[in-house]
Regions:
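PLP-dependent class I/II
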Residues: 1-137
Length: 137
């Protein structure tokens, strides 16, 4: 049972249109942060990495070259002070090893750009190392 006070607050927020105002404002904030992330991805991601262009929500998806494993790359990302959610856990029937979910809802635009730059640098280093391994170099 929800507390009566919480019910009254929710009712008043809805009755006075505060929720509509908040949703409009937060949608604009998330759109700005999404756009910052998309621009940073264009600037910093290595060749062979693709990503979604979401029309809503709080996340976008990165797809790495097939030989990459986002779970195996995660410790290198953390070492570079950036984090993501490996996509494999979102694929219940397997697959998704080369995908990652990125969140743009919380970090500031400055932190988004900084984080994507760090992630791009790490991926460039790791993908180059993987390509050498796979090519026998």
């Amino acid at each position: 049972h929800t507390a009566t006070f919480n019910q009254v607050v929710a009712y008043e927020v809805g009755r006075h249109g505060f929720l509509d105002q908040h949703v409009k404002k937060i949608c604009q904030v998330y759109k700005e942060r999404r756009d910052v992330m998309l621009e940073a991805l264009e600037e910093h991601m290595p060749e062979g990495v693709t990503w979604t262009h979401p029309q809503g929500g709080l996340f976008l998806w990165l797809r790495l070259p097939e030989q990459c494993d986002a779970t195996e790359l995660f410790p290198a990302a953390v070492k570079n002070k950036v984090a993501y959610v490996p996509g494999e856990s979102f694929h219940p029937n397997g697959g998704g090893k080369n995908t990652m979910r990125l969140n743009f809802s919380y970090p500031t635009p400055e932190k988004i750009n900084e984080g994507i730059a760090r992630l791009g640098k790490m991926l460039k280093e790791e993908i180059c190392a993987n390509q050498k391994i796979f090519q026998g170099i």
